[in-house]
Swiss-Prot record:
Record note on what altering residue 177 to A/D does: Decreases activity
The organism of origin for this protein: Homo sapiens (Human)
Record's protein name: Inositol-3-phosphate synthase 1
Positions of the UniProt region annotated as Disordered: 537-558
Record flagged with keyword Lipid metabolism: yes
Amino acid sequence: MEAAAQFFVESPDVVYGPEAIEAQYEYRTTRVSREGGVLKVHPTSTRFTFRTARQVPRLGVMLVGWGGNNGSTLTAAVLANRLRLSWPTRSGRKEANYYGSLTQAGTVSLGLDAEGQEVFVPFSAVLPMVAPNDLVFDGWDISSLNLAEAMRRAKVLDWGLQEQLWPHMEALRPRPSVYIPEFIAANQSARADNLIPGSRAQQLEQIRRDIRDFRSSAGLDKVIVLWTANTERFCEVIPGLNDTAENLLRTIELGLEVSPSTLFAVASILEGCAFLNGSPQNTLVPGALELAWQHRVFVGGDDFKSGQTKVKSVLVDFLIGSGLKTMSIVSYNHLGNNDGENLSAPLQFRSKEVSKSNVVDDMVQSNPVLYTPGEEPDHCVVIKYVPYVGDSKRALDEYTSELMLGGTNTLVLHNTCEDSLLAAPIMLDLALLTELCQRVSFCTDMDPEPQTFHPVLSLLSFLFKAPLVPPGSPVVNALFRQRSCIENILRACVGLPPQNHMLLEHKMERPGPSLKRVGPVAATYPMLNKKGPVPAATNGCTGDANGHLQEEPPMPTT
């Protein structure tokens, strides 16, 4: 990958110090009140001071389910990029990259240059971020296969790439993990040969020792723990069992019901390590969230948003945003990897069904013109296990919407999702953005005491199907709103205004001095090319509309 373009914000509100970037930022929003059936909108403004530490740490990532398809693929991706590997395929030679990663392959607009063109820089250039090639991996798995064998079992990567990676992955072996049969499908028992023995309390202590050992032996400044193991069944929230931090810790000590993922979450929090849940079950029960609050440790979840659901969070936003009343959404999937085999059990499927079904809720609620209170589209989700297709998941969707005057519109979409190749860059982004958030603090004029983000890191919602948010906060599922949130918070950290896409300087008849139009100004009524049709572009497009040549209009007679 090319080095990220450097930039500096020249403003009296931004100071680049040796240790931190400090930026003054005016946060403008609105508050709405209701008086006698009338909505009154009150613009508000809050002055923030953001401080972002510039020193990038040595970061370790521990994956629960390291030997699964996602874990082995992410490890292989980082190694392939670090080693600058390339390999032949039937369509030509491929080179390692980080396509699919928001931080590594996404860009941010800085503004307009002297010619009126937008200038874009890589997402990773906005603030100092850990370089993905510098990440150090470790983790746990109930299967004892080393990472090279796990990579081969997954059947995700081309054979030529696997052969080059084999000697680098063969020495990587997962630590023993926690196996509680009633939480995952019975068909997973054949893999379970690498287990932490003992009581729940003993297992918790062993996980904590593993985290400390990894941090110490690898010389790390920080560790982030990420659950990418099997989907578990939901764990019932019961007062006295897992509703408070104290009760949850007592439950573990007494050996009562607690899921493996919650054990890992508790261990991570107690060790001061951020924990991210990439599966749909309710790992972060109220007691775990309270524990994270007490220890001021970031947690995030739930369920990686990678393929079908990511498309859904765009398409439904488009339909409802266009004024179409979506009334039926039917989503069918079949896949053949281990995730699909585990989801073939009813209780595990139910966890996934819930996370995939709730993704349209906020978009429906945003339009009371279309939907009356309590009204929502019919939404059906089906997942089937078909071993032959492996990691290449097929997703078929049908969206039916009502049009004006009784009409209907139906969209049918087929999406072939390379499951782990879509999930791996999301896991990468989760680790890098979480670590970055750990270096950001801020205060306001009204509250000058520095603080950090809420322990429930809702900024990560772009990357999750069922995003966790702080109590009382709105849940946002619309993809572009989620991306804008991340982009605009990073912009605020360097004193830049939010990206509003207005481009007013290009829409005014007479832009004022502060909105001076830059670049060449087109004639009020531009003439077409007098030499005939627009020449063909290099991509084969001529620019002709529906096959009609662009001809010179007749000159007005005098």
